[in-house]
Amino acid sequence: MASIAIENAEPVPSDCKGDLKISKFDGDLPLKVLYCGVCSLPTEYCEYMPDVAKCRQWLEKNFPDEFSKLTLGISPKQETGTVEGQATSGEEEEKKKQKRGGRGQIKQKKKTVPQKVTIAKIPRAKKKYVTRVCGLATFEIELKDAQRFFAQKFSCGASVTGEDEIIIQGDFTDDIIDVIQEKWPEVDDDSIEDLGEVKK
């Protein structure tokens, strides 16, 4: 129905405010768009990205003629100041960020902490106790998995409370040493220390 209304509509004079003008494109179709190798956007949009300096360096290195076209509007003082000022920080960021297919960011080694598991019995209310196990993370044991294992093994509540601490509800100081050695053989008898009853 809408197409019929358009065909039957009378021509509108050009001096009307609601007149639509259709402009014709003079360039060749399809358009050839140059995409940036850093941000993967068309090079005209690189200026809106946070790492403009990297985009400019890439464009200057790979397409110097396009780079000169884009930098015509920028005064020489602005261009050199921005590129030099951000180039040093851009290079540092480039080292940190992982590139496609690259090695990625090098993880810093953790400080060598002595591998020791400590077990303590902490009094709670009246005659109730909780058992605290610390140091399992030094043996690269996942604390969440260990917490689940202890809760299942002793049929009680267990939770990861600290960076390297598991609290088990109940007094299991006698059994837990054997259970740890049985489950994780890399934890030997010398590296487990029983602190006995400790106050919070």
Swiss-Prot record:
Transmembrane segments: none
This protein's UniProt keywords: Initiation factor, Protein biosynthesis
An example Gene Ontology molecular-function term: translation initiation factor activity
Keyword ATP-binding annotated: no
Biased composition (Polar residues): 78-89
Record flagged with keyword Lyase: no
Domain SUI1: 117-184
Signal sequence range: none
Region (Disordered): 78-112
Biased composition, class Basic residues, residue ranges: 97-112
Function recorded in the entry: May be involved in the translation of target mRNAs by scanning and recognition of the initiation codon. Involved in translation initiation; promotes recruitment of aminoacetyled initiator tRNA to P site of 40S ribosomes. Can promote release of deacylated tRNA and mRNA from recycled 40S subunits following ABCE1-mediated dissociation of post-termination ribosomal complexes into subunits.
Similarity annotation: Belongs to the DENR family.
PANTHER family for this protein: DENSITY-REGULATED PROTEIN, DENSITY-REGULATED PROTEIN HOMOLOG
Name the UniProt record assigns to this protein: Density-regulated protein
Organism: Xenopus tropicalis
